[in-house]
Amino acid sequence: MALMFIILGAAFDFFDGMSARLLHVSSPIGKELDSLADDVTFGVAPATIIFAHLKVMDYPSALECCRPWLPYFAFVVAAFSALRLAKFNLDERQTTSFIGLPTPANALFWGSLLSTHANWLTSPSYMLPVVLVMICLSSWLLVCELPMFALKFKQ
C-alpha cells in the first residue's frame, strides 16, 4: 500500500512540474513547497517504511541491545533526501541531468524492495547489517557528485 502512495506521489510530482512549465508559472515559494512535498513523499515515506521493517527484523544477538533505537536510523534517508532537495534547489548545473540520485528514484527503490522482498529482508538476522549498509549507500548516492540520467523535458 505504501508503495502505491509513493508511485502516486511520483505521478503527481511529475504532472505538477509539467503543468507549471506549460503554464509558465513559477515562484520561489512554489519551488520550496514542491521540495517540502517531495521530502515528505520521497524522504519521510520511505524512511517510515524502513523504520517499520527495522522494528520487526531479526537482529543478530550482538545487536539485540540496539533494537529500541536502531530503527530510527531509517530516518537518515529522510534527512539526506531533504539535503539532496535543498542542494537541487540551489544547484544551477542540474538543468539537463541530475547530480546525485533523485529522491523519487530512491523512494521507489526502497518502496519496491520492501514491498516485494519483505520476508526475505526481515527474517535472516544477517540481513540487518545489509539493510543498514544499504541505508548508508542510498543516502550517500542522494548527495554525491555523480551525474545521473534525467527524464527532463524542455519547453
PLM features: residue spans?
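Functional transmembrane alpha-helices
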Residues: 1, 37-43
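Helix-coil boundary and interhelical linker segments in multi-pass alpha-helical membrane proteins
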Residues: 1-4, 47-72, 113-130
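Alpha-helical transmembrane segments of multi-pass membrane proteins
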Residues: 6-13, 76-87, 114, 134-145
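Alpha-helical transmembrane segments and their lipid-water interface positions
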Residues: 16-20, 41-48
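Interhelical loop and helix-boundary elements at the membrane-water interface
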Residues: 20-39, 83-105, 144-155
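Membrane-embedded helix-turn/re-entrant segments that form the catalytic/gating core
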Residues: 63-67, 72-95
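Membrane-embedded alpha-helical segments that form the functional core of polytopic membrane enzymes
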Residues: 1-32, 69-78, 134
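C-terminal membrane-associated helical module and adjoining short loops/tails
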Residues: 95-155
